[in-house]
Regions:
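Glycine-rich hexapeptide-repeat left-handed beta-helix
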Residues: 1-11, 45, 53, 59-60, ...
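A positional/architectural concept
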Residues: 7, 11-65
Length: 172
C-alpha cells in the first residue's frame, strides 16, 4: 500500500518494485531498481526517507526516521526483519537479518556489514568497510573485497527479482 501523509505522496521510481503487501507512506523517495518486499514498512512521517538505487528492503523490515530524516545509499541489502532507524546508511552496505540500527545521528559509512541480530546504538559512527557484530554492536573486523563482490551479487539478485515480480504482476 502506498499512501500520502500530510499531503505528501511517496516518490517511487518507475523501475522500482513495491509489493502490494508492503506499506510505504509519506515523504519517501525510492530509487531506480530498488525493491520493497512483503510485510515491510517505509515511513516518511516524522522525517524524509530516501532510499537510493538498487537497494532492497526485504520481508518484514521497517525503515523509519526521526525529524532528521534518513538516507539509505545505493546497492544496500536490508535483510529480513531489520529495524533501520539510522540517519545515514552508506552505499554497498548489508544490514543482515534481524539487526537493529537505532536512529539519533547514527551513521554507517560505505561497504559495511551489520551482522544478523546486531544492535547499532544511537549516535554511533561506523567507519567504511567495517564488520559490526553483537549487542551492542562492535567492530570485529574489515569487510573483504570477496565479501563486497558477494554482497553486490545479492543486491543485483534483488534488482532482477523485483523486475520479474513487476513483469509477472502482483504477488498473490
Amino acid at each position: 500500500m502506498i499512501k500520502p501523509f500530510r499531503g505528501i505522496m511517496p516518490k517511487i521510481h518507475p523501475d522500482a518494485f513495491v509489493s502490494e503487501f508492503a506499506y510505504v507512506v509519506g515523504d519517501v523517495e525510492i530509487g531506480a531498481g530498488s525493491s520493497i518486499w512483503p510485510g515491510s514498512v517505509v515511513r516518511g512521517d516524522a522525517g524524509k526517507v530516501i532510499i537510493g538505487k538498487n537497494t532492497c528492503v526485504q520481508d518484514n523490515s521497517v525503515v523509519h526516521s526521526d525529524d532528521l530524516g534518513a538516507v539509505i545509499g545505493d546497492n544496500v541489502v536490508i535483510g529480513h526483519r531489520v529495524v533501520c532507524h539510522g540517519d545515514k546508511i552508506g552505499n554497498n552496505c548489508v544490514l543482515a537479518n534481524g539487526c537493529i540500527v537505532n536512529g539519533g545521528r547514527t551513521e554507517i559509512a560505505d561497504n559495511c556489514v551489520i551482522a544478523a541480530g546486531a544492535v547499532v546504538l544511537e549516535k554511533t559512527k561506523v567507519p567504511a568497510n567495517s564488520f559490526v557484530v553483537g549487542v551492542p554492536g562492535v567492530i570485529k573486523g574489515q569487510v573483504t573485497e570477496e565479501q563486497l563482490v558477494r554482497f553486490k551479487r545479492n543486491a543485483d539478485l534483488y534488482v532482477r527479482l523485483g523486475q520479474e515480480y513487476k513483469k509477472d504482476g502482483k504477488l498473490e
